[in-house]
Regions:
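Interface elements of modular peptide-recognition networks comprising either
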Residues: 8-122
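Extracellular carbohydrate-recognition regions
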Residues: 125
């Protein structure tokens, strides 16, 4: 018997972004529950339910960006994956030690200070 498993990409409906320590102090507005939105730069984006922040893929850096909804699709944000990790991954599959945040310059986040979790709806067919 042959099984075909097809992952259609980053289709998680609801994700949780949690920040701790200095990342939280610098970027607290980015923390919360995000809902799946339209594709941006060829990949799924998510919008924070309670304010005007979003999570999207940035092709030039091949990383995920968490920033203002006004900056959606650009390279401008307050938290980002670090090291070209977005091209073959979903943001909730990026290691918790592979993020950086802005605080008068980019700072590599300590392990587990930036956490992104898929809460609902990432079905594999």
């Amino acid at each position: 018997m042959v099984y075909l498993i097809l992952n259609l990409g980053c289709e998680c409906q609801t994700i949780a972004i949690s920040l701790k320590n200095n990342a939280l102090a610098a970027q607290s507005s980015r923390q919360g529950i995000y809902q799946r939105a339209e594709k941006v730069n060829g990949k799924t984006s998510w919008i924070l339910s309670s304010n005007s922040n979003a999570l999207w893929y940035n092709p030039p850096s091949e990383d995920w960006i968490i920033g203002s909804l006004d900056d959606l699709g650009t390279s401008t944000g307050g938290v980002a994956s670090n090291g070209n990790l977005g091209i073959s991954s979903c943001p909730y599959n990026v290691s918790e030690d592979a993020w950086k945040y802005s605080d008068n310059g980019w700072i590599i986040a300590d392990a587990n200070d930036v956490s992104i979790e898929c809460l609902t709806g990432n079905d594999i067919f």
